[in-house]
Every structure is written in C-alpha cells, then in structure tokens.
Amino acid sequence: SINHTESKNEQQQEVFTLGFNHGCNPRNATYAYIVVPGIHSARKMNHYRKSPVEILANTDSMQIVRHTKLGIWQMVFYKEGTFRSGELSVSVDKACALMIKDGHCGNAELHIADPGQTQSCIKVELLIPEISSERKTVLCDFRNTGIYAGASKAYKLKNIL
C-alpha cells in the first residue's frame, strides 16, 4: 500500500482497460494517448481529437501536455531535466509531477508533487515570460511530510516571480 491514511481493506472500482499489441520485438517504438472522461462513442472521440490538448513531450525522461483553452501545463519528469517550449523553460533537479495553471496571467499557480514519496526537497527553476523576464527558483520541501508524502503543494507564482 502506498497510501497509509486509508483503509487496508481492498477497494475495487472499474476504471478502464488499455491494451496495445506491441509486436514481438519492439524497439524504440512510441505512442501517446490521453484519458478523457465521459467519452462513450467514437463520434464524441472524433470531436475530441480536435481538442486543445497538445502532447508536447513523450519520452522516457518526461511527459508534457498543455491544454491551450484552460491555460494548464501538466508535466511529469521521471528524472532531473529541462523542458523548453518557445520562451517557457522549466527545469527540475529530480523526478516530480508539476502543473502550471494560468501561466499566461498574473494569477498563475505552480503545483508540485513527489509521487515517489521520497520526502526530499525538489528544486524547480522557471522562466515564464508572460509573468516575469527573470528565471526564478522554487524550493519545494517534502521532508518530514509523513502521512502526507506524495501530496502536492501549491505556490502562487506572483509571490515568487
């Protein structure tokens, strides 16, 4: 069990099943998918394909998506790394999950999670030109988080940038 605050009793609920025929010896094969709630027909899925969700990176070191209408960037870094798109730059010193909301305006928020529950400090360096012309650093301290290990922390970027 990774969550020590919930019941130890098994809980079940249908989520979804996804399968791919990878062939016998796939090498460096790639694919991408998004999970969209509430889509129950091929017609609705065809409409969603024209959606504002963009897959910007899908590698063994990071997965980055952006919802252009909602102004949300979601980023999973599997190790230390840097993502750049246009003038936006995000660097992390270790594995983490990030979400940047409203990155185009003064109400921007940064959410940081440590899904590996390492209870360490994660350093995030940001350059978001719409908010500030300077690169800024966020130190997110997950040490001593105990039963809340893995929970995300939120930062108002106007207070940092």
Regions found by a protein language model. Give the residues of each.
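Non-catalytic terminal regions with compositionally biased, polar/charged low complexity
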Residues: V36-L161
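Trp/Gly-enriched beta-strand surface patches
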Residues: S1-T17, F83-S91, K123
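Short, well-ordered loop/turn elements at secondary-structure boundaries
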Residues: R27-A29, G106
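Short, flexible coil/linker segments at or flanking structured domains
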Residues: E6-K8, N21, V53
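Exposed beta-sheet edge/beta-hairpin loop segments within beta-rich domains
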Residues: Q13-R27
